[in-house]
Structure formats: C-alpha cells, structure tokens
Swiss-Prot record:
InterPro entries: Asp/Orn_carbamoyltranf_P-bd (IPR006132), Asp/Orn_carbamoylTrfase (IPR006130), Asp/Orn_carbamoylTrfase_sf (IPR036901), Asp_carbamoyltransf (IPR002082), Asp_carbamoyltransf_Asp/Orn-bd (IPR006131). It comes from the Archaea. It is an enzyme of class 2 (transferase). Catalyzes the condensation of carbamoyl phosphate and aspartate to form carbamoyl aspartate and inorganic phosphate, the committed step in the de novo pyrimidine nucleotide biosynthesis pathway. It catalyses: carbamoyl phosphate + L-aspartate = N-carbamoyl-L-aspartate + phosphate + H(+). L-aspartate binds at residues 82, 164, 223. GO terms for molecular function: amino acid binding; aspartate carbamoyltransferase activity. It comes from Methanococcus vannielii (strain ATCC 35089 / DSM 1224 / JCM 13029 / OCM 148 / SB). This is Aspartate carbamoyltransferase catalytic subunit. HAMAP family: Asp_carb_tr. Carbamoyl phosphate binds at residues 53-54, 103, 131, 134, 260-261. Pathway: Pyrimidine metabolism; UMP biosynthesis via de novo pathway; (S)-dihydroorotate from bicarbonate: step 2/3. Keywords: Pyrimidine biosynthesis, Transferase. Its EC number is 2.1.3.2.
C-alpha cells in the first residue's frame, strides 16, 4: 500500500490487515501509551478545510508512535494565498516529510497529490468524495463493538448525498459477506447514483425517507452538511429532518455511530445509553491511524 486515497483502491485483505494492526496499536496504547517505531519520522498535515477529530487524532497517532508533526490548518498563512498550486505545495512538502495527510474541499485533490508526491499521501477528506481513514475506524468500531462485519444490517440516516464518510463506508462494506444496507434520507439528499452502482449486487439495498431501524445491528447517523449547500434555502428545507431520541433505541440491540460533529440529529440524552458508541468510535481513530501510519511506513521500505 503506497498511498491511502480511496476505499476503492484497497481490498478486503488490506482492510483486515489494517484492522488487525489497529488491535495491536490499541494494545500498545492500553499497555504503554506509546511506541518508538516512527522515531525520527515527520508527518505533514495539510488541512485546507476545518477539522477537529481527524487532524488531532492523526497528530496524536504520530506522536504516540514517536514521530513529529508539521503542517497548517489555515491556508491564509500559506503561499496558497499567493497563488501557489496544490501540486507545487505537495512537491515541496514531500521533501520536508515522510508522510502527508491532506484534507481539501476539491474532489480528487488527494489523488492528484499522490501523483506528484515523493512520500505516501493519506486522504483525510476530499470534498464530498472520500474519507478512507474514517471508514477504517468505522469498520474497526463495528468489529470491536459488534464482534463481526459480515452478515450485519446497517442503517445510514441523514445526509447521504454529501456525506463522504457514508460513500466510503458503503463501498468498503460491499467487500463483506451478506451485508444489508438501509439508506434513509430526504429525497434531496439521496446517496449518489455512482456509489449505488458500485455497490449494487454486492449488498442487499433498500432506500427510504422514513426512519426504520427495526432489526438493524448498526445505526449510522450523519448531520446535514450545511457547508456543502450552494443555496441555503435548500438547506433550510431539509434541516432537522431526522432526530434520534432515547425512546427510539432504548430497548433495541444495536449500536449507534456518528462520524461527528453532531448538530441536533442525536439527542444528548442518548449519550448515556450503552448503544451509543460515537465517542468511543472517535477514540478508535487514534489506534487506527497509528496502524495506517505504521503500515504505510513499513510498505514504503519494502
């Protein structure tokens, strides 16, 4: 594995390898809190869009592995404001670092970066396209909290059009056996046709605008992504469409996930339930990203 750009670039065996390595990294965190396997290595974090969990968990992961971090979170303080192209930026920064993590508003930006970079590139989100490291921590959460991935029924609820975490996770789940996906969204925010075409025939699919979480194993909530709407009047039409309440899940044998940040789609009273796993899901981002950084570094040396 040279880069991590899209879930379409890796297979089931690659995923299982990363999940296995993530278990080892979680054990390292629980036992010692740190490792030195990336001692002397430098991670560059290039965030052209805001981030809290992804950026900080990558920085934490790198430092837990003994490495160092450079980067930016505000492009107004970079040469981007002077007109420097993305490819020039990547060529320069790949000379300063051993690994690059990039988040960018444009679909395809991470792929373009990987084509000119001298070091491995990790996609931390490119527009509404892909978010592969979130997908891997989502899969790790499912495996850790449910015990398996094959044979599960998973309901995705909310913004399935702009939700890159949904696109990546649906594509990854299509690699597993007997998975059923229930896609619940307003008509205006249905999952893109090209994602449906990719997973069609590989999973059992149903689409609806009504919440139905009977007999599902996993509820994956998402926020309506206001920042992706060109017309805010369109956002107002779908804002607050779905809201998961305590009484909806109290007696159900399922887990609730959310890539965060949350707005109002999960009531805060749900947080205390055993079914609520979204904060644990966020924690799992550290061992999973430790695993990704470690494996990319190892594969580069082969």
């Amino acid at each position: 594995m040279r880069h991590l750009i899209s879930m379409r670039d890796i297979g089931r065996d690659d995923i299982l390898r990363i999940l296995e390595e993530s278990e080892k990294m979680e054990a390292v965190l629980n036992e010692k809190g740190h490792s030195d396997i990336l001692n002397g290595k430098i991670l560059a974090t290039l965030f052209y869009e805001p981030s809290t969990r992804t950026r900080l968990s990558f920085e934490t992961a790198m430092k837990r592995l003994g490495g160092n971090v450079i980067g930016f979170t505000d492009i107004s303080n970079t040469s981007v404001t002077k007109g420097e192209s993305l490819t020039d930026t990547i060529k320069v920064i790949s000379g300063y670092s051993d690994l690059i993590v990039i988040r960018h508003p444009s679909e395809g930006a991470a792929r373009l970066s990987s084509e000119v970079s001298g070091v491995p590139v990790i996609n931390a989100g490119d527009g509404s396209n892909q978010h592969p490291t979130q997908t891997l921590l989502d899969l790790y959460t499912i495996k850790r909290e449910v015990g398996k991935i094959d044979g599960l029924k998973i309901a995705f609820i909310g913004d399935l059009k702009y939700g890159r975490t949904v696109h990546s996770l649906c594509q990854a789940l299509s690699l597993f056996k007997n998975v059923e996906l229930r896609l619940i969204s307003p008509d205006e925010l249905k999952i893109p046709r090209e994602v449906l075409e990719y997973i069609d025939g590989k999973v059992l699919l149903s689409e609806t605008s009504e919440i139905n979480i009977e007999d599902v194993d996993v509820v994956y909530m998402t926020r309506i992504q206001k920042e992706r709407f060109i017309d805010l009047n369109e956002y107002q039409k779908v804002k607050g469409t779905y809201r998961l309440l305590k009484e909806h899940v109290l007696e159900k044998n399922l887990i609730i996930m959310h890539p965060l940040p949350r707005v109002d789609e999960i009531d805060s009273k749900v947080d205390s339930l055993n079914q609520a796993k979204y904060f644990k899901q966020s924690f799992y981002g550290v061992p999973v990203r430790m695993a990704i950084l470690s494996l990319l570094s190892k594969d580069l040396q082969k």
